[in-house]
């Protein structure tokens, strides 16, 4: 072998390398999106220039544990140029044997997001109510906030154990 590398050989090996790199990403998979996870009330996540702080978690239930309702108080600051519309579709609450996502179990109590949009630089407090959720019995609880539903691979998450909730109350 002379050690020379022809133009044809160069192009052939370059194409082969490109195919190998593309194939390896198909086999290994790619992690798309950004999903930070916090583990306690009072913590913040920043996703898509939207800062969200889980300020407080309250649970109300009858003495026997029935008629449980959990309320999450979220403070949202919009750092984006476009306005945010925050509705119940932006949230999901999951726990053992419990899922509230775009159904009647989940409700944004305040403010009325259909008549109010959060503009750039504005901060609003949202109360998200999960009906039928008792975090002491169904825990751990995961609250997910999707700032922009068009980019559902980006979300802010809070995984809350019973111990984290007890220390917050």
Q: Predicted regions: what is each one?
A:
Residues 32:
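Short, conserved catalytic or interaction motifs in soluble domains
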Residues 28-29:
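C-terminal motif of bacterial Sec signal peptides marking the signal peptidase cleavage site
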Residues 65-66, 77-124:
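The feature marks short-to-medium sequence segments in extracytoplasmic or secretory-pathway proteins
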Residues 66-72:
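Short, solvent-exposed loop/turn segments enriched in Ser/Thr/Gly
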Residues 37-65:
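Low-complexity, acidic Ser/Thr/Pro/Gly-rich terminal tails and inter-domain linkers that flank the onset
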Residues 122-169:
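Surface-exposed edge beta-strand/loop patches
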Residues 73-77, 129:
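Short edge beta-strand/loop segments characteristic of extracellular beta-sandwich folds
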Residues 1-21, 25:
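N-terminal secretory signal peptides and thylakoid transit peptides that target proteins
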């Amino acid at each position: 072998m002379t050690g020379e590398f022809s133009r044809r050989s160069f192009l052939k090996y370059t194409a082969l390398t490109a195919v190998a790199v593309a194939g390896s990403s198909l086999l290994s998979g790619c992690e798309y999106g950004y999903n930070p996870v916090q583990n306690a009330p009072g913590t913040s996540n920043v996703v898509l220039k939207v800062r969200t702080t889980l300020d407080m978690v309250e649970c109300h239930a009858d003495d026997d544990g029935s008629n449980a309702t959990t309320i999450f108080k979220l403070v949202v600051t919009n750092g984006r140029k476009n306005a945010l519309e925050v509705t119940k579709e932006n949230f999901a609450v999951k726990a053992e044997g419990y899922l509230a996502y775009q159904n009647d179990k989940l409700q944004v109590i305040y403010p009325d997001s259909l008549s109010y949009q959060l503009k750039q630089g504005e901060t609003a407090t949202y109360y998200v109510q999960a009906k039928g959720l008792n975090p002491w019995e169904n825990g751990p609880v995961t609250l997910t906030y999707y700032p922009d539903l068009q980019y559902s691979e980006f979300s802010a998450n809070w995984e809350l154990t019973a111990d984290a909730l007890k220390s917050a109350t």
